[in-house]
Amino acid sequence: MSNKPFIYQAPFPMGKDNTEYYLLTSDYVSVADFDGETILKVEPEALTLLAQQAFHDASFMLRPAHQKQVAAILHDPEASENDKYVALQFLRNSEIAAKGVLPTCQDTGTAIIVGKKGQRVWTGGGDEETLSKGVYNTYIEDNLRYSQNAALDMYKEVNTGTNLPAQIDLYAVDGDEYKFLCVAKGGGSANKTYLYQETKALLTPGKLKNFLVEKMRTLGTAACPPYHIAFVIGGTSAETNLKTVKLASAHYYDELPTEGNEHGQAFRDVQLEQELLEEAQKLGLGAQFGGKYFAHDIRVIRLPRHGASCPVGMGVSCSADRNIKAKINREGIWIEKLEHNPGQYIPQELRQAGEGEAVKVDLNRPMKEILAQLSQYPVSTRLSLTGTIIVGRDIAHAKLKELIDAGKELPQYIKDHPIYYAGPAKTPAGYPSGSLGPTTAGRMDSYVDLLQSHGGSMIMLAKGNRSQQVTDACHKHGGFYLGSIGGPAAVLAQQSIKHLECVAYPELGMEAIWKIEVEDFPAFILVDDKGNDFFQQIVNKQCANCTK
């Protein structure tokens, strides 16, 4: 066997970058000559300013292309009424968030930075530190949330109080530019990243497509669809596969070629992307509460692989599609242009439109009366809640379990009021609350039967589908799970939440137990006291309302 000649293949050969940028400043950059080459000198302040501005913009604004996809739902005759309702709420939320006070989502995410530094770019070193300072500045100065926990030992944690550390991955490349992708990645969508170790046997058209559709179905609605879904097939390692998933979901690899070659270049399979998008529309899950728009788009990327391995990765970017490019070149610091005026996509006739029929529910009365009212309505019923709600999420539930385990009574407020799974962002001056949308319900599933057996958590409010144990617990104890739209945290803070106060564990920050007063807070009955589960009915094709 003759040896093949050496040929270097760039693993991700990209086409032209068509991103539209704006010039932040021409300060902090200069050029110099060294060893016959022109060098771009970048001051440390440039990296700090770039990171600070990029994460500020991404926290309050989204890409124009994404907003146009949301707006298109309103004009699609095949979209369900629930699809259109959710899309309208997203646009209203974006219009509020774009003012720069209330962030798009209360989970303002882990700050992730991917940087590609040209060999003729000099910064003097310490890039991770100066970029981290920019992240710090944004999270400290804006009304964002601190979501990062530092481990003091294997089991004890403390909130870092700054949202640091950031995840920063820097690469050396050719050229005289420094290019970045900045991602504010919330926990809900990050948790929908999966790796499947498969074999060559999967690589037939029928098997692969069916496999991907079934995996796509398992995403559920907990990470706030409509999604930007990414599949990656192959990879020289598992970690390469998942890195590619992350970047593909951010549309970073959109300019890849659309066919492979014998040297192993990555490519997009645009035909399979379209086929999978059509399958996603048939799932019935829609934009959270049934319909067509489970996904805005799908990316499928094929990578080379070791003959003994076939990793398959899946991930999403959620409705808070907070991805933004930036770069530094001779002209200065450039930031990707996001949509400053998302309100332009709201049709005038929907400006003052009501929300359609919703059952009014007064929460300021005995729990038995509230439960009796809810019991009159089927799953999928839209509700409008007014009154007192308790707010608590992961650590709060662990604390409540500790009380029961210690033989103590649950606090009366857990018995008297619904509990909303959420953690607020910082409260801006003059506002009753910071952005406060729901977190993923499924993480609290294991607590439901225990709490309800002790008279607490009888009405739960959160986002996404839940496990059978929650349906069983609600059937057994007469409880309900109500769904809140995942994503429009700013509009909830501005329009529905009238008061916020901490009632327990203030040292836990966003994980504390809070009390809110709400007015016309939107929700849907998803699990009732009779053993019905809205999402299971969709799967079983039994929900008559989900595709109207």
From Swiss-Prot:
Record's protein name: Fumarate hydratase class I, anaerobic
Cellular component, GO, one term: cytosol
Function: Catalyzes the reversible hydration of fumarate to (S)-malate. Functions in the generation of fumarate for use as an anaerobic electron acceptor. To a lesser extent, also displays D-tartrate dehydratase activity, but is not able to convert (R)-malate, L-tartrate or meso-tartrate. Is required for anaerobic growth on D-tartrate.
Top-level taxon in the UniProt lineage: Bacteria
PANTHER family: FUMARATE HYDRATASE CLASS I, ANAEROBIC, FUMARATE HYDRATASE-RELATED
Description of how the protein assembles with itself and partners: Homodimer.
Record field: catalytic activity: (S)-malate = fumarate + H2O; (S,S)-tartrate = oxaloacetate + H2O
Native source organism of the sequence: Escherichia coli (strain K12)
Disrupted-gene phenotype: Disruption of this gene seriously impairs growth under anaerobic conditions on D-tartrate when glycerol is supplied as an electron donor (D-tartrate fermentation). Cells lacking this gene also lose most (about 79%) of D-tartrate dehydratase activity.
Alphabetical list of PROSITE patterns matching this protein: FUMARATE_LYASES
Molecular function via GO: 4 iron, 4 sulfur cluster binding; D(-)-tartrate dehydratase activity; fumarate hydratase activity; metal ion binding; protein homodimerization activity
GO biological process, one term: DNA damage response
Cofactor field: [4Fe-4S] cluster
Stated family: Belongs to the class-I fumarase family.
Binding site for [4Fe-4S] cluster: C105, C224, C318
Keyword line: 4Fe-4S, Acetylation, Iron, Iron-sulfur, Lyase, Metal-binding
NCBIfam families named among the record's database cross-references: PRK15390.1, PRK15391.1, ttdA_fumA_fumB, ttdB_fumA_fumB
Cofactor remark from the record: Binds 1 [4Fe-4S] cluster.
PTM-bearing positions, type N6-acetyllysine: K192
EC number: 4.2.1.2, 4.2.1.81
InterPro entries assigned to the protein according to its UniProt record, in alphabetical order: Class-I_Fumarase/Tartrate_DH, Fe-S_hydro-lyase_TtdA-typ_cat, Fe-S_hydro-lyase_TtdB-typ_cat, Fe-S_hydroAse_TtdB_cat_sf, Fe_dep_fumarate_hydratase, Fumarate_lyase_CS
Gene this protein is translated from: fumB
Up-regulation conditions: Is mainly expressed during anaerobic growth. Is under the control of the Fnr transcriptional regulator.
